[in-house]
């Protein structure tokens, strides 16, 4: 990761900060749960309490999810899918040849490039009142671990987001010159029934939040636990997938301060419905075939030797490399997010109604074995009274880099790749990058 950023000093600092946020996400989301007393209200508080709606409009996540315009619930897989659809934890990839599989992923995105970057879609124009934010920024990082045994999967994903906003005036009930830090941990289990054609998954969602108020050394923190579940239908040798994921709401309470009553923080429920279709000769839903199965068929031995297993794995690798590479994947998603409180994260009045966001994305390997491109778009409804919705355009790529097996640990897949993603809309620009293995 750091090597890929050499010569880009403007990226190094955000990267360090984002990695730090990811490391503490587990601590923020878990340790604060163990100290609920810190979130109790102060009996001497005088000001009226507020419920803060933590709904966020722009898409965050992996470079692939951003590049596809957030249309990801039906194609989520590998470590990128753990936080999106719990059922994706059981997806076995076509280049996974063993009964056991272990995956690790890391993504970083930075949304702070524009002089008037408007993360919260507050409408930063001179014609609007001075309570609008001068600038808002976002920094996102995620790390995920996935373990599979055949059609069973266990995944954990830790996401961290830091959103900062500044405004000229304050809104009663919440300080609006602040930074909001979110740590989210997803712990999912899933199984693929019918030989991996019907995948069901579920698990808890742990969220920790802290709010740094400008001009004050105090940091308000809280945490909560919710649940998430999902399914994925991927018939073998068919060109389509259908999926849905549900995340329950979470309510927590920020501690009171002298003269200020406790505030409730509401993390909304989310529902995502998705469908995907793939054109071209490349299979979207291949059957899981392991080296053990191939070795048993070719040798007739129920317990193949290590050498026979290695030979079978190389045979599967050669089949994978020789398969047709061109494809055009079309993915769509309808995301519905609850609106939950009168005050938004920016400190302005939020609209208490469901947020409906249609999304669409395209992906293709335009240069076989070397380059994948993706593009997409999604609709971001207005979350704050008096502002306008906006349409996002997204894009991304995976490019094959150099060959390095890390002293033989990564064979036979030993080429590295750079993945980039970008999301642009009115007064908004977010970029993401990651380093991984080319498949």
Where are these regions (language model features)?
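Secretory pathway export signals and precursors
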Residues: 1, 26-27, 84
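N-terminal signal peptide c-region/cleavage motif recognized by signal peptidases
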Residues: 34-36
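Secreted/extracellular small peptides and ectodomain modules produced from precursors
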Residues: 3, 28-29, 381
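Subset of outer-membrane beta-barrel
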Residues: 41-439
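Bacterial N-terminal signal peptides
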Residues: 18-32
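N-terminal secretory signal peptides that target proteins for export/translocation
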Residues: 1-17
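N-terminal leader/targeting segments
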Residues: 3, 7, 22-25, 373
């Amino acid at each position: 990761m750091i090597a890929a950023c050499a010569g880009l000093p403007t990226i190094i600092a955000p990267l360090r900060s984002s990695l730090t946020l990811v490391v503490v996400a587990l601590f923020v989301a878990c340790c604060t749960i163990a100290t609920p007393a810190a979130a109790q209200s102060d009996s001497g508080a005088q000001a009226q309490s507020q419920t803060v709606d933590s709904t966020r409009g722009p898409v965050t996540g992996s470079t692939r999810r951003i590049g596809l315009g957030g249309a990801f619930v039906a194609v989520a897989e590998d470590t990128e899918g753990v936080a999106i659809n719990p059922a994706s934890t059981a997806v076995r990839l076509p280049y996974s040849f063993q009964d056991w599989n272990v995956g690790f992923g890391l993504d970083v995105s930075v949304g702070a490039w524009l002089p008037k970057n408007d993360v919260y879609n507050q409408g930063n124009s001179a014609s609007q009142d001075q309570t609008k934010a001068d600038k808002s920024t976002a920094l996102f990082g995620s790390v995920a671990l996935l373990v599979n045994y055949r059609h069973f999967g266990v995944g954990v994903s830790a996401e961290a987001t830091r959103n900062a906003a500044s405004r000229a005036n304050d809104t009663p009930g919440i300080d609006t010159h602040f930074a909001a830090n979110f740590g989210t941990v997803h712990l999912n289990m899933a199984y693929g029934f019918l030989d991996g054609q019907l995948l069901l998954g579920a698990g808890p969602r742990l969220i920790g939040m802290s709010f740094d108020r400008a001009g004050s050394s105090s940091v308000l923190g809280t945490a909560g636990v919710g649940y998430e579940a999902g399914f994925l239908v991927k018939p073998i040798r068919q060109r389509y997938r259908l999926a849905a994921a549900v995340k329950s709401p979470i309510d927590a309470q920020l501690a009171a301060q002298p003269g200020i009553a406790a505030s409730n923080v509401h993390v909304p429920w989310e529902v995502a419905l998705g469908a995907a279709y793939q054109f071209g000769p490349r299979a979207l839903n291949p059957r899981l075939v392991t080296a053990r199965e191939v070795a048993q068929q070719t040798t007739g031995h129920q317990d193949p030797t290590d050498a026979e297993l290695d030979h079978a794995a190389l045979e599967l690798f050669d089949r994978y490399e020789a398969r047709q590479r061109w494809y055009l994947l079309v993915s769509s998603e309808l995301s519905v997010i609850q609106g939950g409180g009168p005050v938004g994260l920016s400190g302005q009045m939020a609209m208490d109604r469901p947020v409906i966001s249609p999304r669409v994305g395209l992906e293709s390997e335009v240069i076989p074995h070397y380059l994948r491109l993706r593009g997409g778009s999604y609709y971001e409804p207005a979350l704050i009274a008096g502002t306008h919705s906006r349409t996002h355009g997204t894009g991304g790529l995976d490019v094959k880099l150099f060959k390095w097996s890390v002293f033989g640990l990564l064979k036979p897949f030993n080429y590295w790749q750079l993945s980039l993603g970008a999301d642009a809309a009115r007064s908004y620009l977010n970029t993401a990058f990651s380093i991984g293995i080319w498949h």
